[in-house]
Amino acid sequence: MIKAVHLTHYYNKDLALENINLQINKGEFICLVGESGSGKSTLLSLLSTLLKQTSGQLFFEGKNYKDIEDIDSFRRTNIGFIFQFHYLINYLTVKENIKLAKEKATHEEIYNLLKILKIENLIDKYPNEISGGQKQRVAIARALINRPKVIIADEPTGNLDSKNSLNVFEIFKRLSEGGTTIIVATHDKDLAKFANKIYEVKDGKIS
């Protein structure tokens, strides 16, 4: 599904990633573990087309990223993003926050997705009326509403307690079993055990 070949990236003259070779298959649950500043977030940004690599090649389903004409459309169609901070808009309901990602999403479509995440009762609630763990599930729903082939999550449980963190990774596991490719950066090696593959990122290299 996603293949990185000799991927290298610099920020100005500072080396962030060096000679990364990586194959990620459909439905795999991949965890990138490592300390802050190790290169995890940079790698996620490159894999998701948010950054353009300094050198090397990236492929999605066999097609070179550089040959994709409308990169914004590609990203919206194929990739869902989840971050440490959920970025929900407080004056919009849960339903309205999700519709930001897909304006034409129906009530039934949103309700069914929230039901999978066990928060369907929150559909008309506002963010300030729900817990941190529930907010992150809403963020997951928003990432899933376009039925992306890949979910990319950067420290998605950084602000959650252990119970809610566990719940989020259980959701990721179920999604991967359903065929969605999951790529998560985390510093929590215990949570990473949910993944099919774990890569350690250190000083811009993976092992």
Residue ranges of predicted features:
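Helix-to-loop junction immediately C-terminal to a conserved catalytic motif
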Residues: S48
